[in-house]
Amino acid sequence: MAATGEALTPQGYIQHHLTNLHVGEGFWTWHIDSLFFSVGLGVLFLWLFRSVGKKATTGVPGKLQCFIEMIVEFVDGSVKETFHGRNPVIAPLALTIFVWVFMMNFMDMIPVDWLPWAAGLAGITHLKVVPTTDLNITFSLALGVFVLIIYYSIKVKGVSGFVKELTLQPFNHKAMIPVNLLLESVTLIAKPISLALRLFGNLYAGELIFILIALMYGANLALSALGVTLQLGWLIFHILVITLQAFIFMMLTIVYLSMAHEDH
């Protein structure tokens, strides 16, 4: 149903759920819902982990403290196994990426009509609640990682070392500089693009499947019953998807930053 109460066609229903609440036009379009949920979940993550950290005890920990300690130890172990340099920033960065991306992905577990319906009561016509189904968000995350790759590459290797890496690899000959530069530039640029598109594609597809299943509820009793079964099955499978995508984004970030710290 639209916020105005008008019945939507299946095509209109899908389009309605895939349209962001936005202001502005063209390049200067701001997706208000994506910004709200991504920033809000980021603040929630910081508050939650800071609160648990301040209340942490050496005695018998509570369930929440145990859960968060388990996440921290898991991420710390992943960093130690993958990152071969020395940088105290990498582990906190990896933890932030993993938990933040997971929380944004987890919004996909909320039934597709609940929050848009509630927003419609307040006069908000469109609301996308999963930030990682917005290409602007995934590219922003990937761009942040890309900036860190360039920064640490120059910091560790120096400007001359970074330039040599781009121009003298894989073929160590001056005559091959144009070829090397082309190959290395494509490889470098492909890193943030693949990070962004992989996360976006998987979550967008998952959201679209939830929307298609939700359409079945408005058909007939048999399709509604089938929709319940399909939604439950996809919900269980999607828990694995959203966790795996957060893990992959984190691990690739660690790998790329580890490569940036390798001084050839």
Curated annotation (Swiss-Prot):
UniProt keywords (A-Z) are: ATP synthesis, Cell inner membrane, Cell membrane, CF(0), Hydrogen ion transport, Ion transport, Membrane, Transmembrane, Transmembrane helix, Transport
Q: Which GO terms describe its cellular component?
A: plasma membrane; proton-transporting ATP synthase complex
The main place the protein resides is membrane
**Which SUPFAM superfamilies does the annotation name?**
F1F0 ATP synthase subunit A
Which GO biological process entries does UniProt record here?
proton motive force-driven plasma membrane ATP synthesis
Q: Spell out the InterPro entries in the cross-references.
A: ATP_syn_F0_a_bact/chloroplast, ATP_synth_F0_asu, ATP_synth_F0_asu_AS, F0_ATP_A_sf
Q: Which GO terms describe its molecular function?
A: proton-transporting ATP synthase activity, rotational mechanism
What transmembrane ranges does the database entry give?
29-49, 90-110, 134-154, 177-197, 208-228, 235-255
Where in the cell?
Cell inner membrane
Organism domain of life: Bacteria
Which one Pfam family would you cite for this protein? ATP-synt_A
Report quaternary structure and partners.
F-type ATPases have 2 components, CF(1) - the catalytic core - and CF(0) - the membrane proton channel. CF(1) has five subunits: alpha(3), beta(3), gamma(1), delta(1), epsilon(1). CF(0) has three main subunits: a(1), b(2) and c(9-12). The alpha and beta chains form an alternating ring which encloses part of the gamma chain. CF(1) is attached to CF(0) by a central stalk formed by the gamma and epsilon chains, while a peripheral stalk is formed by the delta and b chains.
Any idea what job this protein has? Key component of the proton channel; it plays a direct role in the translocation of protons across the membrane.
Task: Please give the PANTHER family that the UniProt record associates with this protein.
Answer: ATP SYNTHASE SUBUNIT A, CHLOROPLASTIC
Q: What is this protein called?
A: ATP synthase subunit a
Upper classification of the source organism reads:
Bacteria, Pseudomonadati, Pseudomonadota, Gammaproteobacteria, Alteromonadales
Q: Which gene produces this protein? A: atpB
